[in-house]
Swiss-Prot record:
Protein name: Catalase
Any one GO biological process: response to hydrogen peroxide
Cellular compartments annotated: Cytoplasm
Region named Disordered: 1-24
Function noted in UniProt: Decomposes hydrogen peroxide into water and oxygen; serves to protect cells from the toxic effects of hydrogen peroxide.
Presence of the UniProt keyword Oxidoreductase in the record: yes
Superkingdom, natural source: Bacteria
GO terms assigned for molecular function: catalase activity; heme binding; metal ion binding
Keywords assigned: Cytoplasm, Heme, Hydrogen peroxide, Iron, Metal-binding, Oxidoreductase, Peroxidase
Pfam families, A to Z: Catalase, Catalase-rel
SUPFAM superfamilies: Heme-dependent catalase-like
CDD domains: catalase_clade_1 (cd08154)
Positions of the catalytic residues: H55, N128
Amino acid sequence: MTERKNLTTNQGTPVGDNQNSMTAGLKGPTLLEDYVLIEKLAHFDRERVPERVVHARGAGAHGKFVTKKSMKKYTIANFLQEEGTETEVFARFSTVIHGQHSPETLRDPRGFSVKFYTEEGNYDFVGNNLPVFFIRDAIKFPDVIHSLKPDPRTNIQDGNRYWDFFSLSPEATTMIMYLFSDEGTPASYREIRGSSVHAFKWINEEGKTVYVKLRWVPKAGIVNLSTEQAAQIQAKEFNHASRDLYEAIENGDYPEWDLYVQVLDPKDLDSFDFNPLDATKDWFEDVFPYEHVGTMTLNRNPDNIFAETESVGFNPGVLVRGMLPSEDRLLQGRLFSYSDTQRHRVGPNYLQLPINSPKAPVANNQRDGYMPFKQQTSSINYEPNSYETEPKENPAFIEQEQEIRGDISGRLIAEKPNNFGHAKEVWDRYSDAERAALVKNIVDDWSGVRDDIKIRNLRNFYQIEPEFANRVADGTGINLEEHVADLK
């Protein structure tokens, strides 16, 4: 016979009646001394934390990453040195713009983030399924997100807002080519690719630095939905991607992704007609070949979504020895913003939560704050100090010195913007079916968008490829010729 398990308060005292509040007699008022009631209501009032300002809707899973090819020639990162090295990971997939309980069928980039619990500390891969972003400079990040979020007056997402922003931000054109393809509505999280979007630096034992981008390729293949297919699913199910991921893992059908690295020698940085460190530019595989790094397998669902999937925090600046951020202007802003939002959302000690806490030992002088439940206990909480048993800095882990490019400090316009060349590359690489889907999806999304905004976007599209602009214009009933004469 199973031993009875008592219901208790958070203080551990058994609860005798969880159905009726304590009152002053049968018809009297409820008593303030009812500790069970007050504790229960007070905790309920505080169950939620602010949702993420982006990537609020997400699903996650635990798993492992196995290094399949040594990366010694590129980096001294410990977990990438030897073939066969296994590293515990937690992955989180998400939509970007919409709220925590929004449909997973909406057109949106998909977040693709992985926390590696390495022997030398945590490493966060923070990416998307799409290989580029809307903007190249972090100073515009709040603006692009505001344009895509609901109107603050109506609380309704409005195409006039984001297409207005896009039309005046021509660097967004390549992202538009991806987002409004069917890849903007993926079939499931198991069938999306992942990209670091940004370039990073890897440094090897000799101190040689290379720029890299990282790519995840799903072993299940990339599968997308048409707008009509997405609408059919949404009519029946808001949670199709989360459900699919959860059920696949529960059934032992563990999703897998191969990780690849693309490498650029710094001496070749100026060899292109674009800036390879610009987040609005893709590194196409035939120009920057893929090298296989390893394989990630997700094999365990979270035990508690709030404590794990909701509370996990990522930052592209969380890197291990042998890795550094690049000079990418968007990345540089994200290095601050991501941990800052976790401190606001979860608390200053969010790294002490089990899902965020490294497996590597933590030894420093950062103490106290709200909820310090993994408090360090030494009486010496300063450094330098003369106590041999206390943690000391280790010069072996000093970051490799990096060359600074440029000699002027100021708000300088990015060099080689090439806002339309990469979008043209994407168009040229699309099949006829992919081009047709892109045009249709844009035309459908322009329902209700003002003509002046459409025309500004069409002028951008014309500079990508006249055929593309003409097909979108035909779909919207706009006479393109009178609006692009000066571009010919």
